[in-house]
Amino acid sequence: LAVFDTAGEVVCAKKRFLPVKEGQLGLRQSDALFHHTVALPEMLAELGSEFDLTQISAVGVSEKPRPVEGSYMPCFLAGVSAAEAFALARGIPLVRTTHQQGHAAAALFAAKGEELFREKTLLFHISGGTTDLLLCDEVKHIETLGTSSDLYAGQAVDRVGVKLGFGFPAGVEVSRLAAECDETIKPRSSVRGMECSLSGLENQCNALLTAGKSPAYVCKYCLLCVADTVVKMTKAAQKEYPGFAVVCAGGVMSSDIIRSWVQQRLPQVYFVPGRYSSDNAIGVSILAAREAGLWLK
């Protein structure tokens, strides 16, 4: 949950991880829907303790993963239900958007404020459920230019982490352990144009562990392979879209190791703070303000 004001400032934001049993790689949709339903009233109360909710002028909600036909996940129903109830009770507009557009809005805002909302931008959205290179047109229209043909980057990172005994999601722990490795590593990535394949990454990491490489080495190798994939896909995109700003978002892109590798090779690429890069409601609140005519008029 987040509050964004008409002055273009994030007033407050709340988030919490849903509980995942040890050794598992996520939640079933029925369990995710249940936990969302339980958490939302509690988090709304927390938000209300920091901000006067009677001052809210519009409500935004992500109703599905992506702005394409057929995109659907049951757990989004919890947020839609809560948002509809709040908006109806207050008699204020309800703005429906998507998880992907929320990520895009938060990342573009963190990168350059309102500037990137007025132009076309290249955006990497890399998380547990996406490895997408997107062409964003004011976040109103999003076109997928490239993606993974199999495993997503976040899945690869989480699988390595869970195999090493970390809880899900494992990205933070994988990054922490990777930082302990000072060996020089040459990653191997599979990229063709703006498309990539990451299924081999999991196998490579398992083989390295079997060969006796340290967990820290394997974690660093995994993250650098993701980083190298980003570099190659970005270079391919820049050939077709020269001069476009490039912004990286998604939980995986919060890694300092990935950021350092990419920016050493592509210093013009924008990475945004973890607060705006990982899953959050900030982008959705920004889009609600814009679509309701309260910001970026």
Locate each region found by the language model:
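Short, well-ordered amphipathic alpha-helical segments that serve as non-catalytic structural scaffolds
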Residues: K14-F17, H35-E50, T229-T234
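Short beta-strand-loop/turn "lid" adjacent to the catalytic site in phosphate-handling enzymes
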Residues: A45-S81
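Glycine-rich beta-strand-to-loop/alpha-helix junction loops that act as flexible
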Residues: V61-K64, S127-G129, V247-S255
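Glycine-rich phosphate-binding/hydrolytic loop that grips phosphoryl groups
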Residues: H103-A107, V272-K297
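A short helix-loop
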Residues: A2-F4, V11-A13, E115-E119, F124-I126, ...
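A contiguous, well-structured pocket-lining segment that forms one wall/lid of small-molecule binding clefts
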Residues: S175-V246, V252-F271, A289-K297
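Conserved phosphate-binding catalytic cores of ATP/NTP-utilizing and phosphoryl-transfer enzymes
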Residues: I92, R96-T121, I286-L287
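Short glycine-rich, Thr/Ser-proximal phosphate-binding strand/loop in the N-terminal lobe
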Residues: L1-F34, H141-T144
